[in-house]
Amino acid sequence: VADWPAVAAGRASDEAMADYLRGLDAGKPVAILHGEPEIGGRFFYTDDMSGLNFQRRNGPLGEALDRLLALKEHTAPSALAVQSTPTAAALPGFAQANPQPLLDASVGPRIWIGNAITTATHFDMNYNIACAVAGRRRFTLFPPDQLKTLYLGPLEFTPAGPPVSMVDIAAPDLERYPRFAEAWATAQVAELEPGDAIYIPYFWFHNVESLDPFTVLVNYWWSETPAVLSRPLEVLLHALASLRDLPPREREIWRGMFEHFVFQAHGDPVAHLPPERRGSLGEMTPEHLARIRAILLRALSQP
C-alpha cells in the first residue's frame, strides 16, 4: 500500500497525517480509549482483574487527533487510541482514495489510530490483512496450536472482544507462566514500516506494538465461510456451561459425539441416510437453521 495517498501523508509528518484524516472526517463519534501513563501503553486488566486499566468513551475523531499530537511533547504520555473504527462511517471516501486490490469491495477497511500502545496477544475469528499507514508497528505471531502455552484470560470479560493472553511478552513471568517458553520458541516477528502490510491467518495469535508517538493502521477482516448461526466462540461458551462439569465418562461420550458429527473424524456421519432425511446433520439449509435457532432459544430461555 506504499502508493496510498494516506501513506504519503503519514510519511510527510504526523501533522500532515492528522490533516489528511480531518479532511475525510464525517464528524461522527468514535470510540476513544485512554489509559494513564502508569500502564506503559498496554491496554489490559487492572492488577486484581476486577476491571480494565483504561477508560473507553465516545468522542470526536478530531479531538483524538489533536490530543495525540499534543501528547508527542510528553516524556511519559498517557495512552490514547481509536481502535477498529469502520472507515465507511467515520471517514467516507477513505476506501475509494486508498484502494486495496486483493479483496472483494464488500470487505471494508477499519482504522486504528494511537500513540505508542500495545494490544495484548489475542486471536481473531477472521482472516486479516493489516496495513501500516503512519508510524511503525511490531507484530509478534504465534500459531493456533500454542493455545495451551499462552495462558488465556477470561472468555467473556476481555479488554476488547476476543480473550487475551495474560503474558506480557515484553517482560514474561516464566515462573508464573512457564509454558510460555514453548510459545516463544514458535514466535514470528514482523516490524512494519509505513506502506507495509502483513497477512494474519485465521486464529493466529498476535501481539501488536505501536512503536511511534503517532501511528495509523488500516486492516481488513474477512471470513472464508461466514458463520451461519453464531460464532464458534459462543459455541465454546455453551459447551463450557453444559459439558465441562459432567462426570468424566459422560464428557468422553460427548467428545466422541463432537468428533463424529461436528469434526467428522470418521468421514461423513450420515452418508447412510437419504439426503432429504439427514436434517441438520446434512446440508445446513435456511429451514434447518431456523429450526436449530428455535430449539436453542427455547432451551436458553429455561430457568
Segments and roles (model prediction):
Residues 1-197, 205-303:
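N-terminal accessory scaffold of Fe(II)-dependent oxygenases
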